[in-house]
């Protein structure tokens, strides 16, 4: 009988833990990802748009983790354009901000200027986030056009080409 309060307390704790466990959410979750085919379609469309404008570029689509999913470099695009395109996509997805906007927000003596010194950050236009159903699912990076704005326009053309495949 002396252990009755202890046993009662143990039962209450066990019951509480069981109830909490029953209400706990799963330890996993589902995420949206671009298919490789959709990523390649966006890359091709951006490359074609830049070609029509007379630009030789590299284009990369990165997934939601910033890992390259699809990549193309046109014949005469400089060797630096490959890593720059990937890093523009990485910067856009990492900071959830298109790089043209990011470049303005981190320029000069702003409090965020130091972020430009982080590895892989490319604070010039040409990195644009890709969203589906309100969720960022990746980003496209373009490098090699004569201006950041031109890189950005080609990236947006790549996204426009896959718009029907994304949930908006």
Label the model's feature ranges.
Residues 1-10:
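Bacterial N-terminal signal peptides that target proteins for export
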Residues 23-168:
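Flexible, solvent-exposed loop/hinge segments and secondary-structure transition points
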Residues 19-21:
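N-terminal signal peptide c-region/cleavage motif recognized by signal peptidases
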